[in-house]
């Protein structure tokens, strides 16, 4: 028997018959060759335990982010760090937007935390608005979870509004968790890492998964000036949680700025074409600042595409969405055209 949690996301590539997995929002160019070379070289060391402190990787991240090494904790993917944060911080109440990434509330629920949700409006393009400030003042949560660009909507959190949220969280004594995992592949996104030293309540989540096409290696990290929190999070994680190949891959990936630049150029060119193609097929496509698009189509679309070997991310289980909502990664011209051709064929059934 196979054991897995309800409504899993990721891993569609392993389902029978899937030839094109658009459910995972990874780099459209795949994995940098230098990263693959680093993984191959690391195989000679797999008989040894990995460094439990990820010292070389942490030093590389510190140089890349311009922060002190003691502000960094690495994990077995961003998801592990979400769960470790929830266990270490143990807020009794939390707030998030809806829709957003489900692992925040999953991790919080395991700690008995009550989660309040601020609804993002479709008529506003799912863009966060000033109403979230009054919502937070009313709910006064112990922790606030935000995602920029948001998953699945692809919208960046407006910088001026983020400044006000930070100020309000400091005033309320609320921790602020900001997921920046898709920021590297977005247009115009600016990290909050320069704000870390202002306030230890700020926590940033990062991942190699999306930016460098490394979902199968599981590698993420977080940044915060709250050293006590990082120590508790580390205690919540299993030892040797980042493998030898993953650590080597992370170090190599951080030197791939040109690869990221090329990926962003592909996304910049292909996203408008894909959006227009989806709209021509009668879908309602939401604005996006990220490397993926949220759209509404026929309820049966997902199943019809699976029969044609293509997997989308069904967003039916997201708070604030429902059946007929889908998310697709923006990929290469050829892959995007395969999707559109399959959708046209499905519509003719």
PLM feature spans:
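N-terminal "arm"/small-domain region of PLP-dependent enzymes with the aminotransferase-like
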Residues: 1-48, 140
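PLP-dependent aminotransferase class I/II
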Residues: 30-32, 53, 201-286
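Phosphate-binding glycine-rich loop
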Residues: 54-94
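PLP-dependent aminotransferase-like
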Residues: 87-146
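Active-site pre-lysine segment of PLP-dependent enzymes
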Residues: 126-140, 152-211
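PLP-dependent enzyme catalytic core of the Aspartate aminotransferase-like
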Residues: 160, 307-308, 317-349
């Amino acid at each position: 028997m196979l054991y897995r949690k309800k409504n899993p996301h990721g891993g569609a590539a392993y389902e029978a018959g899937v030839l094109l997995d658009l459910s995972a929002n990874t780099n459209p160019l795949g994995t940098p060759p230098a990263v693959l070379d680093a993984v191959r070289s690391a195989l000679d060391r797999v008989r040894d335990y990995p460094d439990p402190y990820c010292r070389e990787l942490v030093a590389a991240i510190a140089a890349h982010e311009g922060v002190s090494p003691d502000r960094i904790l690495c994990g077995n993917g961003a998801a592990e760090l979400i769960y470790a944060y929830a266990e270490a911080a143990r807020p009794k109440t939390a707030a998030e937007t809806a829709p957003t990434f489900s692992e925040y509330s999953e991790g919080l629920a395991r700690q008995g935390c009550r989660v309040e949700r601020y609804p993002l409006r479709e008529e506003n393009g799912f863009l966060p608005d000033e109403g979230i400030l009054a919502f937070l003042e009313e709910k006064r949560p112990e922790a606030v979870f935000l995602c920029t660009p948001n998953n699945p909507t692809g919208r960046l959190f407006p910088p001026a509004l983020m400044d006000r949220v930070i100020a309000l969280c400091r005033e309320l004594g609320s921790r602020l968790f900001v997921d920046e995992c898709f920021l590297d592949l977005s247009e115009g996104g600016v990290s909050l890492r320069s704000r870390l030293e202002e306030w230890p309540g700020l926590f940033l989540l990062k991942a190699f998964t999306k930016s460098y096409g490394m979902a199968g290696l599981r590698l993420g990290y977080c940044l915060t000036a709250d050293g006590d929190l990082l120590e508790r999070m580390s205690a919540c994680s299993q030892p040797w949680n980042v493998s030898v190949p993953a650590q080597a891959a992370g170090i190599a990936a951080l030197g791939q700025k040109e690869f990221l630049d090329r990926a962003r150029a592909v996304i910049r060119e292909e996203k408008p074409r894909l959006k227009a193609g989806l709209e021509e097929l009668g879908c309602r496509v939401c604005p996006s600042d990220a490397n993926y698009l949220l759209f509404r189509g026929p309820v049966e679309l997902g199943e019809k595409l699976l029969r044609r070997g293509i997997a989308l991310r069904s967003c039916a289980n997201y708070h604030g969405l429902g059946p007929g909502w889908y998310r697709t990664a923006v990929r290469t011209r050829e892959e995007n055209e395969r999707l559109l051709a399959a959708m046209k064929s499905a519509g003719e059934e």
